[in-house]
Amino acid sequence: GDLSLDSIERLDIHVGATVSDRVVAEIASETQALKTYDRAVGLLATRARASRELERLLVRKGEPPALAKAAVARLAAQGFLDDASFAKQFARTKLALGLSRRRMQTELARRGVDRGTADAAIDEVVVDDGVDEADACDRVAARKFRSLKDLPSDVQRRRLYAFLARRGYEADDVRAVVDRLVGRS
């Protein structure tokens, strides 16, 4: 397996040296840790992830939990993993797609971002982008309503309500928007 230069120096491995059973065990351990770290880097290279999300994914892919935790800690210490930055990026992207604050909180929690970090990130993005949740609900509904215009009004109402509810908008906002777009029946 592969061994980092740091490990080779720390274990005092050099050509012609006698390697004890203890050193062989340490080499195996270091090799596994490096493999787990490399896998974590690869997963992080495909897309940004939250710390807990990455740790769970590594374990699900068969990495030992202790090594997954160590790899995540190392990446965080190196500045490659930052839940606050991830949450802001996630919130900005999802806000543009029309997700509500509540739905973003749920999605971030599912990815392992703690509630305080998620709320702070969402608040910052909402303030920076000047988003009003009722207006966002209205915009998303209007866009969706265009695809429903040929359907009977009861079907429009049901589908639009379900669509907005899945995005996590407040029931009062959803009801008002649906009533305005579909008309009261």
Give the positions of each predicted feature.
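An alpha-helical, amphipathic repeat domain used for nucleic-acid recognition
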Residues: G1-S185
